[in-house]
Curated annotation (Swiss-Prot):
The keyword Transmembrane applies. GO terms for biological process: mitochondrial cytochrome c oxidase assembly. Keywords: Membrane, Mitochondrion, Mitochondrion inner membrane, Transit peptide, Transmembrane, Transmembrane helix. InterPro entries: Cyt_c_Oxase_assmbl_COX16. Present with 672 molecules/cell in log phase SD medium. It is found in: Mitochondrion inner membrane. This is Cytochrome c oxidase assembly protein COX16, mitochondrial. Required for the assembly of the mitochondrial respiratory chain complex IV (CIV), also known as cytochrome c oxidase. May participate in merging the COX1 and COX2 assembly lines. It holds the Pfam family COX16. Belongs to the COX16 family. It comes from Saccharomyces cerevisiae (strain ATCC 204508 / S288c) (Baker's yeast). It is a single-pass membrane protein.
Length: 118
């Protein structure tokens, strides 16, 4: 035997509950569940989507501000400021050969610092 979820109320308490807003809503909800629960839920979802669309529009407007058309003068300035291209230089830069001009040097230890030899 299990306990039911229904709260025990005296006759007087039950009449007061049924006259309250919560009691009337529960009674109407049991008769027409879609009208009193499903429809407001769906309306909240749809209206929330419209309300939040303004926030997503801001995101796309900021992206549009970043992307602009470039006129011919700007293109000429960009091309003028470019560094010269040499295929051999790019090859060596990509190979990282210029970064191999270093020598590993051990850092001097502090006094009383162990060697950490395993």
């Amino acid at each position: 035997m299990s306990f039911s979820g229904k709260k025990f109320r005296s006759r007087r308490q039950q009449l007061v509950y049924e006259a309250s807003l919560a009691g009337r809503y529960k009674k109407a909800l049991s008769k027409h569940p879609f009208l009193f629960f499903g429809l407001p839920f769906c309306a909240t979802i749809v209206l929330g989507s419209f309300w939040l669309s303004s926030f997503t529009a801001i995101k796309y407007e900021q992206g549009d501000r970043k992307v602009q058309e470039i006129n011919e003068e700007d293109i000429l300035k960009i091309r003028k400021n470019q560094r010269e291209f040499d295929i051999k230089e790019e090859y060596y830069r990509l190979q990282g050969l210029s970064e191999e001009d270093w020598e590993p040097v051990r850092v001097a230890r502090l006094k009383d610092e162990s060697e950490n030899v395993w």
